[in-house]
């Protein structure tokens, strides 16, 4: 398709995003979120794509989950393909209202079945955007974003998921219970937009901020390549080794409420 159509701009939004699924099957996160991104980057470079926008997530900031680290690696890979004549950048944002698997869709489905609504924790908060807001800001980010940068979109204040559930129950006029089931592996109480080493800088658009410009050393590029070579060896399937390699690649990745926490104690 790339050779035939020769696109000039690519918006890369394909990803696996189901948190518990990826904690259980980290190789799937690698195959889709990392290797899939790398395949698109190579195809884009081969046909001379001038602008590549990688759609990332707030879970990539100080990641504690397989999903988060896989998207953080994708950010770094995207930056590594940029040069002086192109703009390869990433855009982080949070939950998109109404998208497949979003909390609103899940809650409404639970209400339609008579409940209960299941929450992982009473104090969980998340950032939200509408689909139209997300599309408009991603397109604008592609227009103003600089090469090798990571951009953050203005999503307003984080929203209490408990409050969302309460409002939906109230509007349904049905006696629906709320059940607290506990945080899932890799889940945060609140999402962060920036790494601990980043600061939010203004851009030409008041709703788009610059988190950082990725500058990857030659040594880090060699490390990325060596990790990818190991993961691509025939028959490789060791989840613990995969996560260990990713922790070497992304040192800010610290597992939480997960079987992979043991690797952080080594």
Q: Residue ranges of each PLM-predicted region?
A:
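Conserved Rossmann-fold cofactor-binding substructure of NAD(P)-dependent oxidoreductases
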Residues: 1-9, 186
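A generic secondary-structure signal
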Residues: 4, 43, 140-141
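Short Gly/charged-rich anion-binding patches and loops
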Residues: 6, 39, 73, 163-164
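Conserved Rossmann-fold NAD(P)-dependent oxidoreductase catalytic core, especially the SDR/UDP-sugar
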Residues: 12-75, 80-81
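Short secondary-structure boundary/capping segments
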Residues: 4, 26-28, 68-73, 106-107, ...
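Strand-loop microenvironment adjacent to phosphate/nucleotide-handling motifs in alpha/beta enzyme folds
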Residues: 75-95, 100-266
